[in-house]
Amino acid sequence: MFYTCGPNEAMVVSGFCRSPPVMISGGSVFVFPCVQQIQRISLNTLTLNVKSDKVYTRHGVPVSVTGIAQMKIQGQNKQMLAAKCQMFLGKSESDIAHIALETLEGHQRAIIAHLTVEEIYKDRKKFSEQVFKVASSDLFNMGISVVSYTLKDVHDDQDYLHSLGKARTAQVQKDARIGEAKNKRDAVIREANAIQEKVSAQYMNEIEMAKAQRDYELKKAVYDIEVCTKKAESEMAYQLQVAKTKQQIEEEKMQVMVVERSQQIMLQEQEIARKEKELEAQVMKPADAERYRLEKLAEAERLQLIMEAEAEAESIKMRGEAEAYAVEARGRAEAEQMAKKAEAFQTYKEGAMVDMLMEKLPLIAEEISKPLSATNKVTMVSSGGSEIGAAKLTGEVLDIMTKLPETIEKLTGVSISQVARTG
């Protein structure tokens, strides 16, 4: 007789000529009645709800864990099929499921006892992998393959997990408040730093602008001084050149006038000569002619002297005017120089006054020594306790010179030695 089975079950034929028994998964077989026996075993996937109630963890906290496991007998694996037939042949699916469930539940309890609540709750994947690994080896020996295992639920009756959640929630809220406060603090600090940097940058910019303005004013003042100096020098040079030119023009005019006067004298002389010839040509007495000639010569000499005197006077006048203009230009230049010296004296005060005094000291010494230079004879009288001769005279002159700074200080209030030390 032929028997068939679907892919979700297997047939085991034993008896006459079937040693060892034949196992067929999803196929057909011929069985001799009365001498051979056929038995069926299910290959369906089993879904097990593995529940462990009040299992004590490593820290002694009782928890209840529920897992979902998928079991299956691999019909193509002859070794697993033979093992299952040896273990479960003749048993129903519920019996097989109960045995597998008890095995899984025992491994699940053992693994829970070695872990803490936090490890089970927070790392479910690790817990599932451990249960799957431990249970797979035992169930494989029974001919059952663990397809999958998933941790479904973890809870306890002591509100331990709830307390963990509260603590975690409080910690998260605390961290959130701390983070918010830190962010606000950092924002305020960054804003203050930004304001400080802005103000510092503004002040630095103003300082740089002030420095640039100061440098500009200083350079402009220097350039203005140079320009004014050059202008003054140019004006002085121009005025001197104008004075020289005017003087040259006046000299040329005087030379022209002298030449004109000379020409006039020559013309007069020629006229006198012509008249003399006329006299000679005329019939006159020699004496009268000689007298007339002498008179004319005297007249010509008189006119010549008058014209020469007038020319000399005009030349002297022109030269005087030119020299007066030159002296006037020089006076203006010296006045400008004195004005600049006055500005320098105003700026440097005592130093400038000392400088002026030092320039005039030689003149003062010269004036002091003038009486001595006019002395023809000096008679030295000594009482016997002091120097005599030239040494005494030199010493007295030196005493006079050394008293000059003291005299200047009394007259002007400026100490030459004090200014020299501070300068």
Swiss-Prot record:
CDD domains linked? SPFH_flotillin
For this protein, the record's InterPro entries field holds: Band_7, Band_7/SPFH_dom_sf, Flotillin_C, Flotillin_fam
Matching entries from Gene3D superfamilies are given as: Band 7 domain (3.30.479.30)
Q: Which Pfam families match?
A: Band_7 (PF01145), Flot (PF15975)
**Record keywords:** Cell membrane, Endosome, Membrane
Q: What is the tissue specificity? A: Normally expressed in growing retinal exons of newly differentiated ganglion cells at the retinal margin. After optic nerve injury, expressed in all retinal ganglion cells and retinal axons. Also expressed in endothelial cells, spinal cord, larval and adult skin, muscle processes, thymus and gill macrophages.
Q: Which GO terms describe its biological process?
A: positive regulation of cell junction assembly; positive regulation of cell-cell adhesion mediated by cadherin; positive regulation of endocytosis; protein kinase C signaling; protein localization to plasma membrane; regulation of receptor internalization
Recorded GO CC terms:
cytoplasm; endosome; flotillin complex; melanosome; membrane raft; plasma membrane
Subcellular location(s): the record lists: Cell membrane; Endosome; Membrane, Caveola; Melanosome
Q: Name one GO molecular function term.
A: protease binding
Q: What is its main location?
A: membrane
Question: Which topology term describes how it sits in the membrane?
Answer: Peripheral membrane protein
What's the superkingdom here?
Eukaryota
Outline the inducing conditions: By optic nerve injury.
Family affiliation = Belongs to the band 7/mec-2 family. Flotillin subfamily.
Give the record's subunit note: Heterooligomeric complex of flotillin-1 and flotillin-2 and caveolin-1 and caveolin-2.
Per the entry, what this protein does is: May act as a scaffolding protein within caveolar membranes, functionally participating in formation of caveolae or caveolae-like vesicles.
- Report the protein name in the record: Flotillin-1
- Species name: Carassius auratus
